[in-house]
Amino acid sequence: LRGPSFTVSTACASSNHAMAQAFAIVRSGMSPVMVTGGSESMLCFGGVKAWEGLRVMSRDACRPFSANRNGMVQGEGAGVFVFEEYEHACARGAEVLCEVAGFAMTSDASDIVMPSKAGAARAMQGALQDAGINREEVGYINAHGTGTAANDKTECAAVADVFGTHADQLMISSTKSMHGHVIGGTGA
């Protein structure tokens, strides 16, 4: 491992931003392969108390987009991906599992637990534009879906703004119901 190496620290977006940067480096030709991902372990007294202080923690389970949701649950975990230029992967006989077509990054510094619809919409619109695909080509969204009323409602409104009538055809879920909110490792 001798290519670009750096750490990204942007809260819940850290691993997504790290993967976007790895994708951009491969796409630019700076490196044919990048290893990227994210991890987080905040299941300690201070970490739990900090989120409890924000009053966003569930008493029992994380249920993103459910009428019975009552907050998030912390988790810990990690994920690592290999981003590789397609011809380079084929030349070495690698099994290509998926393709990343595009990405976007935005900033939404208004509130840590009350995201803005505009910020989420800009990110989705930018990703569609960068990928060069129409919104009707999207069939599934793995949403941030924290299980808090504020986040879930805002995300749904942003999806409706970006995808219009196609939003009714989309499958949307959040894996946080299975592993909790992994903070910086969430995207990986």
Please tell me what each predicted stretch does.
Residues 25-28, 48-59, 118-122, 154-166:
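A glycine- and small-aliphatic-rich helix-loop capping segment at beta-alpha/alpha-beta transitions
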